[in-house]
Design a protein with these regions (language model features):
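Well-ordered alpha-helical segments within folded domains of soluble proteins
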Residues: 43-49, 107-115
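Conserved N-terminal diphosphate/IPP-binding helix and adjacent helical/loop segment
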Residues: 1-73, 77, 81-96
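Divalent-cation-assisted or electrostatically stabilized phosphate/pyrophosphate-binding catalytic cores
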Residues: 88-112
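Transmembrane helix-loop-helix
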Residues: 116-125
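A generic signature of intrinsically disordered, low-complexity regions enriched in glycine/proline
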Residues: 83-87, 112, 124
């Protein structure tokens, strides 16, 4: 398998990690699914997977790529609130559909999910 196919396969697992394990609370779940409905290019995750292929375990490589995407997405959601943006990537922004408070809270939820993954990556085995 060539390295680009391997990266694509790993990106699938990154996406699965990001979209999985969402809180059962209906309103949070609805907004979270809305934010991650499109796959996007995942350039940050791609770069992480490529650069970390030298010395990282597969589990941590995928988790680190997911962390980067989650942190990036959380900053975009918060940025839309601060800038009072109506659209992000051609779609209505969270704060435009729901409210600024929803945007801040879901951004914080996404940050928290990333931090939980960070703690897991940092555990001594």
């Amino acid at each position: 398998m060539d390295s680009m196919n391997l990266i694509e396969k790993e990106l699938y697992h990154v996406e699965k990690m990001i979209k999985g394990d969402v809180v059962k609370e209906k309103s949070i779940k609805e907004i979270y699914k809305y934010i991650f409905k499109s796959d996007g290019k995942k350039m940050r995750a791609r770069l992480n997977l490529i650069s970390s292929s030298i010395n990282r375990k597969k589990k941590n490589r995928i988790k680190l790529a997911a962390i980067i995407e989650l942190l990036h997405t959380a900053t975009l959601v918060h940025d839309d609130v601060v800038d009072e943006s109506s659209f992000r990537r051609g779609n209505e922004s969270v704060n435009n559909i729901w409210s600024n408070a929803h945007g801040v809270l879901i951004g914080d939820y996404i940050y928290s999910k990333a931090f939980i993954y960070m703690v897991d990556v940092g555990k001594k085995e």
